[in-house]
Design a protein with these regions (language model features):
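Intrinsic, short, N-terminal disordered tails of RNA polymerase sigma-factor systems
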Residues: 1-16, 135-142, 162-165
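Sigma70-family region 2
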Residues: 22-23, 49, 60-77, 96-98
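DNA-recognition helix of helix-turn-helix
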Residues: 80, 91, 152, 158, ...
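Short, charged helix-capping/linker segments at alpha-helix termini
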Residues: 22-31, 41-60, 168
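Structural recognition of an alpha-helix C-terminal capping motif at a helix-to-coil junction
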Residues: 42, 56-63, 76-88
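Acidic, proline/glycine-rich intrinsically disordered inter-domain spacer in sigma factors
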Residues: 110-137
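Arg/Lys-rich amphipathic alpha helix in sigma70-family domain 2
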Residues: 70-73, 84-105, 125
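A short pre-motif secondary-structure segment
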Residues: 146-150
Length: 181
């Protein structure tokens, strides 16, 4: 019977899984993890630029989201709420690591990757994408992070300002300057 319950969870909408998680259903929690871990890892990796740290941030963020699920009010989608947790934790970890200066920024590979891992065949598209990636690696950290959040993750200026503790005007200016750089 448990196998049938577990399999049926795969077809359930996220809004049906949340109440099960709140009641401590481990299968529902695992299903949420399975649905979101790849995407959240990629979000974190784009910010922290280290696969081990991104893995840790993703797991800590998912655990945090599941333990604080009662605070989820449904004002945004669960995925957007979880993504915000991952972004905030990723930025926190990145800043913490930079303070300790554990990594030489010049040696860190920054790679933009689709959630499904698709790599285009077209050589020209790949060449342009590689040029964009190389250019973004050269940007100051605040420019790189704000551009990543805006262009890749799809956050608007207000959300980025909130995440990075900037006013709306300063956020727009920073992104504009980052694009010019």
């Amino acid at each position: 019977k448990q196998t049938n319950t577990f399999l049926s969870l795969e077809k359930r909408h996220i809004d049906d899984l949340i109440p099960l998680c709140l009641n401590g259903n481990r299968h529902a929690q695992l299903e949420i993890y399975n649905r979101y871990y790849k995407g959240m890892y990629n979000v974190s990796y784009r910010i922290v630029k280290d696969s081990t740290i991104a893995e840790d941030v993703m797991q800590e963020s998912l655990l945090s989201a599941l333990t604080k699920l009662d605070q989820f009010k449904g004002e945004v989608s669960f995925g957007a709420w979880l993504k915000r947790i991952v972004v905030n934790n990723s930025i926190h970890q990145y800043k913490k690591r930079m303070k300790r200066q554990e990594v030489d920024l010049g040696n860190v590979m920054y790679k933009v990757e689709d959630n499904d891992g698709y790599v285009p065949d077209n050589g020209m598209i790949e060449l342009k994408a590689q040029k964009v990636i190389e250019t973004m690696k050269l940007l100051k950290d605040n420019y790189r992070i704000s551009l990543t959040l805006h262009l890749i993750e799809g956050y608007d200026y207000e959300e980025i300002g909130e995440i990075m503790n900037l006013s709306y005007a300063n956020c727009r200016t920073m992104i504009s300057r980052a694009k010019e750089s």
